[in-house]
Regions:
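Active-site beta-strand-loop-beta-strand hairpin of nuclease catalytic cores
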Residues: 56-68
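Anionic group-transfer/hydrolysis microenvironments
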Residues: 46, 59, 72
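A short acidic/basic microdomain associated with nuclease active sites
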Residues: 34-51
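Conserved beta-strand termini and adjacent loop/short-helix elements that scaffold enzyme active sites
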Residues: 43-44, 101-103, 121-123, 129
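A short, well-structured beta->alpha microelement
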Residues: 52-53, 75
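Catalytic cores of nucleic-acid endonucleases
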Residues: 66, 72-121
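Non-catalytic C-terminal interaction segments of nucleic acid-processing enzymes
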Residues: 2-35, 110-184
Length: 184
């Protein structure tokens, strides 16, 4: 954990406000992805069929890379996550890069499965605790900690595009703000 997450006395910083809900943390994760170069982002409100059964809390795409953020509000939720098939068999999961987002104290770097990164939500902002790559590393194949299930990602994207077509989103993008705001 870097110094930004510790108090001068060595304790862990806590949020000044009440703990965030799962929905609030998912929205924070999506904003964070958009602010970090992921121009196509889906929140947990978007439900799509995938071949692996995974329903990401936040999934972002940029040229050459995908990033999954899994939100955890409690330690028990984090521990239960390990039982999911796409966690025990990472090749079945989505995201070339995968991160947990939680409030400080729920998950530590020592708790992370191999290849996973950690982000903390502190006072409405996301702090990069472990594993967030530099801008040039996103597309370097050997730097990617996971080989994402590209079929599942394509299923997910197809479902999104199909919904746009069904809803009649205009070619000139006039409805783009509505789509981004409401998660399709």
């Amino acid at each position: 954990m870097d110094g930004a997450e510790q108090t001068p006395g060595g304790g862990v910083m806590q949020n000044a406000r009440h703990p965030k809900t799962h929905r609030e943390l998912c929205e924070l994760a999506c904003r964070f992805l958009r602010n970090n170069g992921f121009k196509v982002v889906f929140s947990d409100r978007f439900h799509a069929w995938t071949s692996c059964g995974e329903h990401p809390d936040a999934l972002g795409f940029r040229n050459g890379a995908s990033c999954l953020i899994e939100v955890k509000c409690s330690r028990s939720d984090f521990l239960a996550d390990r039982k999911k098939v796409f966690r025990s068999e990472p090749e079945k999961g989505m995201g070339d890069w995968r991160f947990y987002l939680c409030e400080p104290g729920v998950i530590t770097v020592a708790d992370l499965p191999a290849g996973w990164g950690l982000l903390y939500a502190i006072n409405g902002r996301v702090r990069k605790v472990h594993g967030w790559p530099g801008n040039h590393q996103w597309v370097v194949t050997v730097a990617k900690p996971f080989r994402a299930n590209k079929q599942a990602e394509c299923d997910y994207l197809f479902s999104a595009l199909r919904r746009l077509e069904i809803r009649g989103v205009t070619e000139n993008g006039a409805d783009a703000d509505r789509v981004q705001t409401y998660g399709l």
